[in-house]
C-alpha cells in the first residue's frame, strides 16, 4: 500500500452507523456534541458525536441535498439542494425554522459567516445573503458564469465567490464587489488561509491558483493528473494540501510563496484521492480515497502515513471535530465512521 510504512498504525473507529445512501455532507456542531450527515437522496441525520445515537432527522431536499452548514452557536443547521431551496433547521425544536428560494433550479453551496449572523448561498450566477431570521438581505451578481463555490474570509464579513475567469470578493454591507482576482480559467473550489492572507482555488484545467490577497500577486501550480477539487489549509496558514490525482500534494506557502518550490508528495491512495482535510489548529492531514481507505499524515515530519484504516466503499466526506480529536468519515455506501485521533 502506497504511503504505508512499518511505523504506520492501524486507524480504528470507535463507532460506526449505516445511513441509507451516499454521504454528500458531514459537519460537526461547533460544540462537538452533535454532527450532521447529509445523504445524496435528501435526508439529513443529526447524530450524537459520542455514540451515533439519533438526535433528529430532517427531510432535507426532495431532489437531493447538496450541502450543509452549522451556524456559529450551533442552533441552526442550513441546507441546500437540487430543488433550489435553502432551509434552516432548528436543531433544538427538531423542525424547520425557515426556507427561502435560491433563484436557480439547484443551489451549489451554503456557508454561515464566522459570527453566525449571515448565511450565504450560491445558486446559478447569483449569491444571496439571509439573516438568521430568514430575511433576504442582499443579492450579489450576476457573475460571469455559475458560481461553483463560496467562502467567507476568516473573521470577516467579506465573501469570495468563484466564476469563470475570476474570483470576486464581496462585502456583506456593500452592493458592489470589493475586489476581483482575475485569470483565464474555471475554478471549482476555493479556500482561504486561516489568517486571510492567501486565497487558493482548485481548477478545471488541472491546476491550482494562489493569490496573496493584499497585493493581488498570483501563482499557478500545474502538473496535476486531473481537475483539482480538493483543497485544505493547515491552521498555521503555511501548508496547502491539494488533490487532483491519487497523491496529496502539500505546498509550502510561507513567504515569499509557493512559486519555485517543490511540493511534498504524499503517495496517498491506490486509486483516486477523493477528499482531504487538515485539522483546524494542529498539524495532521486526513485523506480519503476511492479504495475506501482513510489515512492520517503529519506532513511536517515526512512522507509516511501516521495511521490508516482498512479499505471499503469509496470515501466521500471527511470532517474534523472542533477540538481536532475526532475524525468523521462518510462513504458512498452511506456508512459514517468516527475515529479518535488524539495527537
Residue spans of the language-model regions?
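WD40-repeat beta-propeller superdomains and closely related acidic/aromatic-rich repeat-like regions
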Residues: 1-343
